[in-house]
Amino acid sequence: MRTFTLIAILTCAVLVIFHAAAAEELEAQDVIETEALATLDEERLFECSFSCDIKKNGKPCKGSGEKKCSGGWRCKMNFCVKV
């Protein structure tokens, strides 16, 4: 009976350790992907807004005095962002 109890306890311990390690790995992957996406979005927003303030493909994103963006651009925080 002692052997069976010891085997059951060891099996549960191994399962808990395995589960914790797998959860840690998944959490680490989620953090890495989230940070990568946030960086990409920030870079894209900066690139689009900076390009839009100057000109994109030789034409301004917004016509003079217009508040709406055109040609696949969308206004976000007073900048044109490529959709």
Swiss-Prot record:
<keyword id="KW-0964">Secreted</keyword>
<comment type="similarity">
    <text>Belongs to the neurotoxin 12 (Hwtx-2) family. 03 (juruin) subfamily.</text>
</comment>
<dbReference type="GO" id="GO:0090729">
    <property type="term" value="F:toxin activity"/>
</dbReference>
<feature type="propeptide">
    <location>
        <begin position="24"/>
        <end position="44"/>
    </location>
</feature>
<feature type="disulfide bond">
    <location>
        <begin position="69"/>
        <end position="80"/>
    </location>
</feature>
<feature type="disulfide bond">
    <location>
        <begin position="52"/>
        <end position="75"/>
    </location>
</feature>
<feature type="signal peptide">
    <location>
        <begin position="1"/>
        <end position="23"/>
    </location>
</feature>
<keyword id="KW-0960">Knottin</keyword>
<dbReference type="GO" id="GO:0099106">
    <property type="term" value="F:ion channel regulator activity"/>
</dbReference>
<dbReference type="InterPro" id="IPR012625">
    <property type="entry name" value="Hwtx-2-like"/>
</dbReference>
<keyword id="KW-1015">Disulfide bond</keyword>
<keyword id="KW-0872">Ion channel impairing toxin</keyword>
<dbReference type="GO" id="GO:0005576">
    <property type="term" value="C:extracellular region"/>
</dbReference>
<dbReference type="Pfam" id="PF08089">
    <property type="entry name" value="Toxin_20"/>
</dbReference>
<keyword id="KW-0732">Signal</keyword>
<keyword id="KW-0800">Toxin</keyword>
<feature type="disulfide bond">
    <location>
        <begin position="48"/>
        <end position="61"/>
    </location>
</feature>
<protein>
    <recommendedName>
        <fullName>U3-theraphotoxin-Cg1a</fullName>
    </recommendedName>
</protein>
<comment type="function">
    <text>Probable ion channel inhibitor.</text>
</comment>
